[in-house]
Amino acid sequence: MEQYQEDFVEFILDSGALKFGNFTLKSGRISPYFFNVGVFNTGQYLSQLGKFYAIAIENSGLDFDVLFGPSYKGIPLVTATAVAFNNNFNKDVSYSFNRKEVKTYGEGGGIVGHSLEGNILIIDDVITAGTAIHEAVDIIKANGATVKGVIVAVDRQEKGKSGQSAIQEVEQNFGISVFSIINLSNVVDYLKQGNNHALIDRIEVQR
């Protein structure tokens, strides 16, 4: 685990973004943990979050032209990450996001920010059912651009009915790369540093 990944695990635990208990996910599965990106509701939190995304993207070596954040949760993620690229890597990165309701007045259209052209990197929080990514891919292709990949904050590493994880299904269905700041194994490795054996056992059962 890289240092920035360990720092990110600490960040989501200290902020309360990663919670443990019994949660029903969008997919209908019951999970012993839940990642809530809505906790990052201050400028300081968003600044830190954007920096972690930017570091992970830089480390991936992925070449892209525009960052795209699916509305609504992807909007603060993509803007924070674009700012983080400028502040931490001196890179002026283009970004855009979609409107849920297409605007029929003013400049109109369904895309806000940079036009979708070239290679697009999608930013989201997690992939549970893959619905939001499917919609984002459709939007990007409809605008004549190419989906280069997807980055999420946390790879849950949970297998669905197909025997594959949601991320593996997205990679297979769309032929794109999906990577994350951290995955569940990173969280487990971090928890092993403390006396969290019962919690680790519950998490491992879901994998």
UniProtKB/Swiss-Prot annotation:
Protein's UniProt name: Orotate phosphoribosyltransferase
Residues engaged in binding orotate: 34-35, 128, 156
Lineage: Bacteria, Pseudomonadati, Pseudomonadota, Gammaproteobacteria, Candidatus Pseudothioglobaceae
Family: Belongs to the purine/pyrimidine phosphoribosyltransferase family. PyrE subfamily.
Taxonomy, superkingdom: Bacteria
One GO MF term attached to the UniProt entry: orotate phosphoribosyltransferase activity
PANTHER family: OROTATE PHOSPHORIBOSYLTRANSFERASE 1-RELATED
Pfam families per the UniProt record, alphabetical: Pribosyltran (PF00156)
Catalytically driven reaction(s): orotidine 5'-phosphate + diphosphate = orotate + 5-phospho-alpha-D-ribose 1-diphosphate
Pathway noted in the entry: Pyrimidine metabolism; UMP biosynthesis via de novo pathway; UMP from orotate: step 1/2
InterPro entries: OPRT (IPR023031), Or_phspho_trans_dom (IPR004467), PRibTrfase_dom (IPR000836), PRTase-like (IPR029057)
Residues engaged in binding 5-phospho-alpha-D-ribose 1-diphosphate: 26, 72-73, 99-100, 103, 124-132
